Every structure is written in structure tokens, then in C-alpha cells.
Amino acid sequence: MLRSTTGVGDVIGVDQRFAEVGDGRREAEHGITAYADLEDALPRVDAVVIATPPASHAPLALKAIAAGKHVLVEKPMATTTAAARMLVDAAAAAGVVLMPGHTFEHNAAVHKLRDLVRGGHLGRLFYLDCARLNLGLYQSDVNVIFDLAPHDISISNFVLGATPTAVTVWGSRHVHPEHEDVAYLRLDYADLGVRSNIHVSWLDPRKVRRVTAVGSKKMVVYDDMADGERIRIYDKSAIPPDENAAPLSGVAYHLGDVVSPFVPFAEPLAVQDQHFVDCIASNSTPCVSGSSGLAVVQALECAQISLREQRPVALAEVAQRQAGSPAGLDATIAWTSVG
């Protein structure tokens, strides 16, 4: 997909497994110039795309930024708030583009959901409910929260135009002895009076990718698995009893139409890649910036503390933490030369 992006010249690959085969074979098999060591590739590229295990994201990105390269890094941008802040500060100091791979923020259906919520079409927003479920794929280096929740945290922040003030998590291990495979997160957006509830699982019979927004007047379901009808608007609501009515008066219900507006589809990954290249060419800040990635990592760190200590954790508690240092360079990485 990178090679079909307007503005991209050569694509160079870096994978430590390439050290096991000869130059001709690795280039013939992958169709790109390939290196086993990133130090050899850095002088030949203008920008870097990092798609590696999460623990390696920050150290690899820092190395690329130090070499003056623009960076698109897969979610999560880092595994600690301190490391994510280092990336943001380093990119600003180097004058390079830093963009986290929050792919769903480039999804037209998610943009439609945001417009409906922020435009007041649902009335007063009560809550968001997100579900990201499937049977697998189990990861060996992170739990289900770090694997799947970054998507729904970024979607929630994007739709609401805010960051959570606190995170509460419940999680459990059923198959993997070290990593939670099912988790429930509650993100409190106290300034908005809204919560986003997130259910992530590697242990579910169905593949679910869904966000529900419930308001005082209408409700919306974004279902990424629904071909052609990813957005469905429900003219439904619950009407509270009149405060002047008799004590036994109950809740009334409004049941109206269900509408699925046409939302033109464009592959989000392609949109993301093109935006990254365009930002490099125009020397502009991405719509999904390093600060967006930092906010997601802060929520993830809160989630890990909440999971361990079984309590709500405020983002303010981890926002200033500088403990921990990025480590771990054993990874697969893709590099792209922009020309």
C-alpha cells in the first residue's frame, strides 16, 4: 500500500530475519530493497513507518527521529507516558512529523459518528459503548488492553473532542498465564459528564467492531463489520417522567425510524498513509498528532495501574511521571523513502 501512495518513491524494508538469507533472495521474495539492520537503512530514507511489537515502538522511533526522519508509528505510540512524551518532545525539537497509527481516526464512518455527536443530533450525549471482540489473536508480549483498546480510546477521544479524566479497568486471564484476554474499561470524561465503556476480548465467538452512542433524543451505532451500513441512526429515546406528574408515572419511550446514511468508503490505512506523506511535503502537523498518541498512552498507563490496583486512576496521576525508559530493539520495521 505504501508504494501506491502519491509522493512515495522507494520503499525499503528492515527485518532482522533478513540476516538469515542473501540479498538477492530477500529482495526477490519481498520486492523491495531490504536490510537486516536499521542502521544501514537510515541514511537511505526520509521517513519511517514502524509496525513492530509495542515495547519497541518508542526506542525505534527515537532512533529515527534522532536521525532526522519523519515517523509514523503503529498504536500504541509507546508503552509508558514518559516514553510517549519523549517522542513528542524529540520530534518537536528535530522539526519532523510524528504521527501515531490511529487508523480509525481516518475512517469516514467514525467521522460521521463524530459529526452526529458533536453536532447535537443525538441531543445530550449520555454515553459511548465500544466493543472490540474476536477469537484471538493472542499476543505474547502484551495483554488485550494494549492490543485492542488503543483503537477505542482514540475513537472515544476523537468523537468527544476530549481526553478522559480517569480510567477504571476490570480484566481477567483465561487462556494465557501472564496476559489478560478479556477486559472492560470505563473512561470518565468528567468535563463532559460522559463515560465511554470499552469491552475488549481475545476470547469471543464473534468478531465485533462496534461503537454505540446514546443520547437523550437519538442513538447511533457504528458497526465496522456491516458492509454498506456502517452507520445506523435510531430515532429512539427514553423520556423521563414529568417532575410534576403523579409518583407512579413511568418512563415513556419514543420509537421512530432507523436511518442508514450513505457514507463514502475510503480505505482508512490508505488515507492515513497519504496524510502522513502530505504532512511531510507541506511541513504541517498531522490531524492525528503525537499529542493524540500521548493521550492514548496516558489512558493505557492508567488502565494498567487500575488493573493492578483495582481502583479508578486519574490521568493527572500519570501525566507527569517520568519513570521508565524505552527499551527493546528486537523488532520488524518497515521504512519508506519519500520522493
What are these regions (language model features)?
Residues 11, 46, 126:
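Conserved acidic residues
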Residues 78-140:
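A contiguous active-site-proximal alpha/beta segment in oxidoreductase catalytic domains
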Residues 9-10, 278-296:
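Glycine- and charged-residue-rich phosphate/anionic-cofactor binding loop of Rossmann-like
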Residues 8, 32, 67-69, 94-96, ...:
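A short helix->loop->beta-strand "cap" motif at the edges of active sites that frequently abuts
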Residues 36, 50, 73, 98-100, ...:
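Hydrophobic residues in well-ordered beta-strands that form the structural core
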Residues 150-238, 262-284, 301-302, 318-339:
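Contiguous beta-strand/loop segments that form the cofactor/metal-binding neighborhood of enzyme cores
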